[in-house]
């Protein structure tokens, strides 16, 4: 398909092949939107954005190698003219707050009608912000994330099953420092251990 001169150039990032294909097919039905690349992980998405400089990146929030949140934060600095829309199956207020803090211009649930995604692409391209209304209301009333960025990094890895030794090596910290951060996170969340703390934080959208 040949893109019209005024077409909005979009890159899609989604690790589920069927969902990726469906999103691409739906957006390609729009006469003013062209999908110029499809990627299955965050690193490939970042590479594609760097190479193709799209108008809009539509990305899943949970991605291998680099999450949608990490992508949005990176692009805000390195490619400010590419606007990010995050799609998610998780109606968690904490995710929305983190997405907006990362610089995402749109945040939608995957179960919304296809026409809403196309409209969101257009509005974000014009410089507007698009947020699912129900999620916006929940986020306004939700409790604030008490975790620091470092606590979040460490707790996420602990929740994935990494040991303190592995986390320390990966983040270039001492094991004692890792344990201190974990203790702080556990206390803030009122959890019984690191696994429980990670579960609580994920439920609230803080990881």
Task: Describe each model-derived feature in a short phrase.
Residues 6-19, 23-27:
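Conserved acidic segment of CheY-like receiver
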Residues 52-58:
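Active-site beta3 strand of CheY-like receiver
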Residues 63:
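Receiver (REC) domain active-site loop signature in two-component systems and cognate sites
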Residues 94-153, 206:
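Short, flexible helix-to-coil linker/hinge segments that flank and couple to helix-turn-helix
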Residues 163-196:
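Recognition helix of helix-turn-helix DNA-binding domains
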Residues 32-40, 48, 191:
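Short hydrophobic/Thr-rich beta-strand motif most characteristic of the beta2 strand and flanking loop
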Residues 41-44, 67-71:
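Acidic catalytic/metal-coordinating carboxylates
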Residues 60, 88:
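Active-site residues of response regulator receiver
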């Amino acid at each position: 398909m040949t893109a019209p001169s005024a077409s909005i150039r979009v890159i899609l990032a989604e690790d589920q092949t069927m969902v990726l294909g469906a999103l691409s097919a739906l957006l390609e039905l729009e006469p003013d939107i062209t999908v110029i690349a499809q990627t299955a992980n965050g690193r490939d998405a970042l590479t594609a954005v760097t190479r193709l400089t799209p108008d809009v990146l539509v990305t899943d929030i949970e991605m291998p190698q680099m999450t949608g949140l990490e992508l949005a934060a990176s692009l805000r600095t390195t490619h400010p003219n590419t606007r990010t829309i995050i799609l998610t199956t998780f109606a968690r207020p904490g995710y929305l707050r983190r997405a907006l803090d990362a610089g995402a211009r749109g945040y939608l649930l995957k179960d919304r009608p296809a026409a809403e995604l196309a409209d969101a692409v257009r509005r974000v391209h014009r410089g507007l912000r698009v947020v699912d209304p129900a999620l916006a209301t929940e986020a306004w009333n939700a409790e604030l994330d008490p975790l620091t960025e470092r606590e979040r990094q460490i707790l996420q890895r602990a929740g994935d099953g990494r040991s303190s030794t592995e986390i320390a090596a990966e983040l270039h910290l001492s094991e004692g420092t890792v344990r201190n951060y974990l203790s702080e996170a556990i206390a803030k969340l009122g959890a019984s251990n690191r696994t429980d703390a990670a579960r609580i934080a994920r439920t609230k959208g803080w990881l």
